[in-house]
Swiss-Prot record:
Signal peptide: none
Note describing how the cofactor binds: Binds 1 potassium ion per subunit.
Protein name: tRNA modification GTPase MnmE
EC number: 3.6.-.-
GO cellular component: cytoplasm
InterPro entries: G_TrmE, GTP-bd, GTP-bd_TrmE_N, GTPase_MnmE, MnmE_dom2, MnmE_helical, P-loop_NTPase, Small_GTP-bd
UniProt xrefs under Gene3D superfamilies: P-loop containing nucleotide triphosphate hydrolases, Probable tRNA modification gtpase trme, domain 1, tRNA modification GTPase MnmE domain 2
Binding sites annotated in the UniProt record for (6S)-5-formyl-5,6,7,8-tetrahydrofolate: R23, E80, K120, K443
Organism this protein belongs to: Mesorhizobium japonicum (strain LMG 29417 / CECT 9101 / MAFF 303099)
Residues that bind GTP: 227-232, 246-252, 271-274
Domain of life: Bacteria
Protein residues bound to Mg(2+): S231, T252
Enzyme class of the recorded protein, top EC level: hydrolase
Length: 443
């Protein structure tokens, strides 16, 4: 358990607020509670107290809860003061608490860092807590909660346990090659399991893009010729005038982005400059940005004016294409039905026709790309990198023409170490500052 300084911070949201929660963790916690709350309180019970400074000055009235270590979030003694959420109240409470000997203001993520160092959470669970705090959609929340409960960590630890067992079997075969206690078929069983694990890890790595879509968003880029109605559609989907709409071609020269929540999934929609030949110098820069953005898209919306269909030439990007006919309101009913058949979706932003159908189709494609939010997926690039590293060691170990059993066993050890670094079981000190800097002060 960590010893030394105690830390304090505001753990609740932005001030002013109805209630603010101040959290303290460390060896001085009990003394701070006794002093400010006028005596110790029962463990894990919210008690109403008048809070006073050491000189007797009344600071506020509120609830105090004490969580004795190691059965607390950080593994240390922890207390929470629930006070009125005014800026002056919180500032004075923090000033008084941090004024105690051995108590200081917490750094970003320091409470969670102490929880990790005290074995209360592993690194994957820590990252999931950061995702949960930052979750904006239902899919992000569900994904983060599942990983925070240890499902992802357990998968990596189960692979690691299998490798440790495999290595033990191989080393036993090496050490007792002349004994009858070790069956000759042990190595065959071990390498069969290792090859199966290689496939399992490969399939798991393949799910990273789905995890990216859940965490970062499904990228949708609007493309089309100038005046095809891109900015009008963008504004309609954003439900505000985010883009300038005029009859003059080439009005949009920079990328405009808005975030939507479709069926609980985050969807990032980008409006781009109209694609055309021989644009002006500034407009050409916008078109180049549009092409670069399209290269990173998950879905391209190709908009075309139904009254003036044209040929744009080769389109940027390799993402699936959704052809959208615009300005449907300018046609009579019969012509509109005929024209709509040429597109995946035909819309009229002015009348609202087809816009909800387009949103539904985008949402369906986003859901297909994200897959089942309950699937166990690698949630960080570092997971993918370490999983790939583990598999490279396993491939070398499992190769038919591999060197002696000793070297193959060493490759198994290195693979297990790579998996261990994902959850923080070994050698992760260099990653801690990066990971915990993602948290707010009070977490």
């Amino acid at each position: 358990m960590i010893s030394g300084d105690s830390i304090v911070a505001l753990s609740s949201g932005r001030l002013p607020a109805g209630v603010a929660v101040l959290r303290i963790s460390g060896p001085q916690t009990r003394f701070v509670v006794e002093t400010i709350a006028g005596g110790m309180v029962k463990d894990r019970v919210a008690v109403l107290r008048r809070f006073k400074a050491p000189d007797g000055t009344v600071l506020d009235s509120g609830l105090v809860i004490f969580f004795p270590g190691p059965a607390s979030f950080t593994g240390e003694d922890v207390a929470e003061f629930h006070v009125h959420g005014g800026r002056a109240v919180v500032a004075r409470m923090l000033e008084i608490i941090s004024g105690f000997d051995g108590v200081r203001h917490a750094e970003p993520g320091e409470f969670t860092r102490r929880a990790f160092l005290n074995g209360k959470v592993d690194l994957v669970e820590t990252e999931a807590l950061a995702d949960l705090v930052n979750a904006e959609t239902e899919a992000q929340r569900r994904f983060a909660v599942r990983n925070a409960e240890g499902v992802q960590s357990e998968l990596y630890l189960s692979w690691r346990r299998r490798l440790i067992h495999a290595r033990a079997m191989i080393e036993a075969e090496i050490d007792f090659a002349d004994e009858d206690d070790v069956p000759g078929s042990v190595s065959d069983t071990v390498w069969s399991d290792v090859r199966a694990m290689i496939g399992e890890i490969d399939r798991h790595i393949a799910g990273f893009h789905a995890a990216e879509i859940i965490r970062e968003g499904f990228e949708v880029v609007i493309l089309g010729a100038p005046n095809a109605g891109k900015s009008s559609l963008f504004n309609a989907l954003a439900r505000r005038d985010a883009a300038i709409v005029t009859d003059e071609p080439g009005t949009t020269r920079d990328l405009l982005e808005v975030t939507l929540d479709l069926g609980g999934l985050r969807v990032r929609l980008t409006d781009t400059a109209g694609l055309r030949e021989a644009p002006g110098k500034v407009e050409a820069i916008g078109i180049e940005k549009a092409r670069a953005k399209a290269d990173r898209a998950d879905l391209l919306l190709l908009l075309e004016d139904i009254l003036a269909p044209g040929v744009l030439g080769p389109l940027p990007g390799k993402a699936p294409l959704l052809r959208v006919g615009t300005k449907l309101d300018l046609l009579d009913e019969g012509s509109a039905r005929e024209a709509a058949g040429r597109y995946d979706v035909a819309i009229s932003v002015v009348g609202g026709t087809g816009v909800e159908a387009l949103l539904a189709e985008i949402g369906r494609r986003a859901a297909d790309a994200a897959g089942d939010v309950g699937d166990v997926l690698p949630s960080r690039l570092r997971h993918v990198e370490l999983l790939g590293e583990a598999n490279r060691h396993l491939l070398r170990a499992a190769a038919e023409d591999a060197a002696g059993q000793e070297l193959r066993a060493e490759e198994l050890r290195l693979a297990a170490d790579s998996l261990g670094r994902i959850v923080g079981a070994i050698d992760v000190e260099d990653m801690l500052d990066v990971i915990f800097s993602q948290f707010c002060i009070g977490k």
